[in-house]
């Protein structure tokens, strides 16, 4: 029949997006309608046209079809209602869609499912729940396509009470074993942070797909329950279910968070052998793991994959690449990655500046910061958090003051305790302890970092009493010290020879503050006793501590013996330090000085031979001073400066002043460090 032929032709045209020709065919079909059969064909043709209007986003054409349906009196026909609801929902005209459903007599859940799914897609979760309640009130029973959207809405709105109501209706329905419904239930309880119910639902499922496994693994991951997540991942792997890239990323990210960096890289390597391959998230996880363990070779491999996949242009990937190279001390490649992009974001600028700052490349970091300003970017809290610690480490007071002014001019930094702590540290490490205290007094909130910087600053100035008073103020304020704070206090006691105070803190640090002494704390005690001349006690500390002494610990004891003229313990410390074959050339100078003082010339010759064989060479010492005209650099033995004739007599005077105030006599037999190095060279 001609009508059937036109109907088939219309369906073909509509499904292939030829809307204009489909409408022409529809007009011909209407002219041919003269029986009940042809009316039915017209009805289904209108339904096909509405679907085509959705596909090609032809709103006005769809409205014309709707108008025809109204004029024909078939607007609420069971064939057309779902199509009309789909049409209006596709254009986010949900009121029109719901009005059509409400005015129809259809008791099938399909049109409601379409409306509810559209609400959920547009994140109108309150409307999802309202539509579901209206649907149930009309006596329409939900089906397996209704529940997932409603459960998602309950989870997103954290409507625990109604979520349980919906769950209850599922339990008494035939859909309690539906794969999609169970997956939605697990996801909802994940949002409710109810791991118990989520896991029970998962365990009772007869059928599980990748979504099921991902949902419950993600539940555990979101709660930081990584051992359970890892266990389920292994079970998923052995069950034969295809592991999606999302699951790989969740588990490898979990390894990263729990400190299992090698495990994270192992998972990333396994991903490369599967069809999932690496996506940008996986690459970022892998690069972060590489940066944390210094695996630059694998980092370069991931970089190559990023280039091959065109992911290296993604901002987050590029920033992580810069960080990886910086952490692996390969600033050349970090800068190459940075320079490859013409327009860098503020995050990218922060990444490269942070890389140079962490490696104490102050000149390069300052130059990059100036470049960033010229490019029109203003430093944010992350920029300042990178630069200020560098200013503190190199005692760059001038730059610290400039950043202080920058912070003061911007109210947005008022409550950034981390930045104010960094400023306190800059002033303290630059010797401006009064200014550091003034900055801390103006802070709205102080924490253990604030007090640690002040204690360390006063300790280095020889103000051990003030440092102890600050420590008491800190603990009385309810601020709990950490292990770094205790190191600062012990160091302050050491510099001021407050032996009894240091002993008391060391004895009670675990029982009173819950801080177990680590190697740093024991080394501080060695320094405390050594500076005070209690060398036997310092030796006992090393003998009895539960850690293997580091080169720095032996050097501390050795230097104390050198100062106080105790060659017996000094020779013992020198031998122990020499056994470690340290890379620090200054340690060999200490050892050589001790053997020279003890008259052990054969040992001294042995030290010289070891230094020569290992190629140990001490770089000339250098320092700099910040003046109004900029930084002036001083190097050992440098006479090129026009001020050298004035500088060296002043330096000799300062050296003598330090010796006079040190409280001990200089052994005239021993050579200076530089003289010994010249003899060994």
Swiss-Prot record:
Q: Where are PPR repeat segments found?
A: 108-142, 143-177, 178-208, 209-243, 244-278, 279-313, 314-344, 345-379, 380-414, 416-446, 447-481, 482-517, 518-548
Q: Where is this region: Type E(+) motif?
A: 629-659
Family of the protein in this entry: Belongs to the PPR family. PCMP-E subfamily.
Q: Does the keyword Transferase apply?
A: no
Keyword Repeat listed: yes
What Pfam family is a match, any one? Answer: E_motif
Q: Which Gene3D superfamilies match?
A: Tetratricopeptide repeat domain (1.25.40.10)
Region Type E motif, as annotated, extends over 553-628
InterPro entries documented for this protein: E_motif, Pentatricopeptide_rpt, PPR_At4g14850-like_plant, TPR-like_helical_dom_sf
Q: What is the protein name for this chain? A: Pentatricopeptide repeat-containing protein At1g71490
The protein's UniProt keywords, in alphabetical order, are: Repeat
One biological process term from GO is: RNA modification
Q: Enumerate the GO terms in the molecular function aspect.
A: RNA binding
């Amino acid at each position: 029949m001609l009508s059937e032929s036109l109907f088939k032709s219309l369906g073909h045209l509509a499904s292939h997006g030829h809307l204009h020709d489909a409408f022409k065919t529809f007009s011909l079909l209407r002219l041919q309608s003269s029986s009940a059969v042809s009316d039915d064909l017209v009805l289904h043709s209108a339904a096909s046209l509405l679907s085509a209007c959705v596909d090609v986003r032809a709103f006005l054409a769809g409205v014309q079809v709707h108008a025809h349906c109204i004029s024909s009196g078939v607007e609420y026909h069971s064939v057309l209602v779902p199509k009309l609801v789909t049409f209006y929902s596709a254009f986010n005209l949900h009121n029109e869609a719901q009005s059509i459903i409400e005015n129809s007599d259809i008791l099938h859940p399909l049109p409601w499912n379409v409306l509810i799914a559209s609400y959920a897609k547009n994140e109108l979760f309150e409307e999802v729940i309202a539509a579901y309640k209206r649907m149930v009130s009309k006596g329409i029973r939900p089906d397996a396509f209704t529940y997932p959207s409603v459960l998602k809405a309950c989870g997103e709105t954290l409507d625990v009470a109604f979520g349980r109501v919906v769950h209850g209706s599922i339990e008494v329905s035939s859909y309690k074993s539906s794969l999609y419904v169970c997956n939605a239930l697990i996801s909802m309880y994940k949002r409710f942070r109810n791991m118990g119910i989520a896991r029970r639902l998962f365990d009772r499922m007869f059928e599980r797909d990748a979504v099921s496994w991902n949902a419950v693994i993600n539940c555990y991951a979101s709660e930081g329950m990584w051992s359970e997540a890892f266990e389920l991942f292994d079970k998923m792997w052995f069950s034969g279910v295809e592991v999606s890239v999302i699951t790989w990323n969740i588990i490898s990210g979990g390894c990263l968070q729990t400190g299992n960096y090698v495990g994270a890289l192992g998972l990333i390597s396994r991903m490369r052998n599967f069809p999932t391959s690496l996506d940008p998230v996986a690459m970022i996880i892998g690069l972060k793991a590489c940066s944390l363990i210094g695996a630059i070779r694998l980092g370069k491999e991931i970089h190559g994959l990023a280039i091959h996949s065109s992911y290296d242009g993604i901002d987050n990937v590029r920033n992580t690449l810069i960080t990886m190279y910086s952490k692996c001390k390969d600033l050349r490649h970090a800068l190459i990655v940075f320079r490859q992009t013409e327009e860098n974001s503020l995050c990218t600028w922060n990444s490269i500046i942070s890389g140079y700052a962490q490696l104490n490349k102050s000149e390069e970091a300052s130059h990059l910061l100036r470049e960033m300003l010229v490019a029109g970017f203003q430093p944010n809290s992350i920029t300042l958090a990178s630069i200020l610690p560098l200013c503190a480490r190199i005692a760059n007071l001038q730059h610290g003051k400039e950043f202080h002014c920058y912070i003061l001019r911007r109210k947005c930094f008022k409550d950034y305790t981390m930045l104010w702590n960094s400023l306190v540290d800059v002033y303290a490490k630059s010797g401006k302890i009064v200014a550091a205290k003034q900055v801390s007094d103006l802070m709205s909130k102080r924490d253990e970092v604030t007090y640690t910087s002040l204690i360390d600053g006063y300790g280095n100035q020889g103000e051990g009493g003030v440092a102890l008073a600050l420590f008491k103020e800190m603990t009385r304020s309810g601020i709990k010290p950490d292990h770094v704070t205790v190191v600062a206090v012990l160091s302050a006691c050491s510099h001021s020879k407050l032996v009894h105070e240091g002993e008391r803190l060391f004895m009670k640090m675990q029982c009173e503050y819950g801080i177990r002494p680590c190697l740093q704390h024991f080394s501080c005690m060695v320094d405390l006793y050594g500076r005070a001349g209690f060398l036997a006690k310092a030796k006992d500390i090393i003998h009895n501590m539960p850690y293997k002494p580091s080169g720095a610990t032996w050097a501390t004891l050795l230097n104390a013996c050198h100062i106080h003229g105790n060659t017996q313990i000094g020779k013992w410390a020198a031998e122990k330090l020499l056994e470690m074959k340290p890379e620090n050339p200054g340690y060999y100078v200490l050892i050589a000085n001790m053997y020279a003082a003890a008259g052990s010339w054969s040992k001294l010759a042995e030290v010289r031979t070891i230094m020569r064989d290992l190629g140990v060479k001490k770089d000339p010492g250098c320092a700099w001073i910040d003046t109004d005209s900029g930084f002036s650099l001083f190097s050992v033995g440098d006479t090129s400066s026009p001020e050298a004739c004035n500088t060296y007599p002043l330096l000799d005077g300062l050296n003598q002043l330090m010796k006079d105030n040190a409280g001990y006599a200089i052994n005239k037999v021993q050579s200076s460090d530089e003289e010994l190095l010249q003899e060994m060279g």
